[in-house]
A protein has these predicted regions:
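A short beta-sheet element
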Residues: 80-137, 141
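A generic structural motif
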Residues: 129-130, 167-173
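Non-catalytic DNA-recognition/assembly elements of restriction-modification systems
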Residues: 1-78, 171-193
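Glycine-anchored helix-breaking recognition loops at helix->coil/strand junctions
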Residues: 1-7, 11, 122, 139-170
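Sequence-level motif detector for i,i+2 pairs with an aromatic at +2
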Residues: 36, 65-68, 94, 121, ...
Length: 193
């Protein structure tokens, strides 16, 4: 298994520095944690319709095709395990936070999915009108910092709704969604997201 350096060089030459040109090179935000508060997952995704389990209970049940991603219980590759066709009964709406609740080694991680997809039954999907690609990335980063609580065989399961995460807040009851969005936008390369 030798590394084909010529192929690596050929591929790297397909991209130029212009492909990654950004005006954002330094963060513009000062993180004042004194305004941050703890919020439970069920307060961020209120109502049973906003925290729902994935619909695919067997990978073999996926329809043939390549229009949609099948997301499984893994962090690598943003959870993508396969591509599949459309099935109205199995599709999950995108623009959500994906909580990995079961599986081998990735329990406790979170993902952000921007498009419709097929979700494993080992996942719980969180929906909130304030979620977008920026707030989604912010939340996933914070949620992944809480992962240590769910290692060594402990699963999200019944603990997920009551899990608390520290977020910027407008007041004790309201997360500061615009701060989260603007912070991600201000990060180096935030304009390329």
């Amino acid at each position: 298994n030798k590394i084909d350096w010529n192929e690596i060089i050929r591929i790297s030459n397909l991209f130029t520095a212009e492909d990654y040109h950004t005006s954002k090179t330094t963060p513009e935000f000062n993180l004042d944690l004194s305004t941050w508060r703890y919020f439970s997952i069920d307060s961020l995704f209120p109502g049973k319709e906003n925290l729902i389990r994935g619909k695919v209970h067997s990978k073999e049940a996926l329809p043939d095709g390549d229009e949609y991603y099948y997301i499984g219980a893994k962090k690598k590759n943003n959870g993508i395990e396969a591509r599949c066709g459309f099935d109205k009964e199995l599709i999950s709406e995108g623009n959500c936070i994906v909580f990995i609740c079961n599986g081998q080694g990735s329990v406790g991680y979170a993902l952000y999915m921007d498009r419709d997809f097929m979700a494993s039954g080992d996942l719980v999907l969180g929906y909130n009108e304030h979620i977008n690609k920026y707030t989604g990335l912010f939340l996933v980063t914070i949620l992944d910092k809480e992962r240590f609580k769910y290692s060594f065989g402990r699963k999200y399961g019944k603990y997920l709704p009551n899990t608390k995460i520290l977020l910027p807040a407008k007041d004790s009851m309201t997360p500061d969604w615009s701060f989260m969005e603007n912070m991600i936008k201000s990060m180096p390369y935030g304009d390329l997201i």
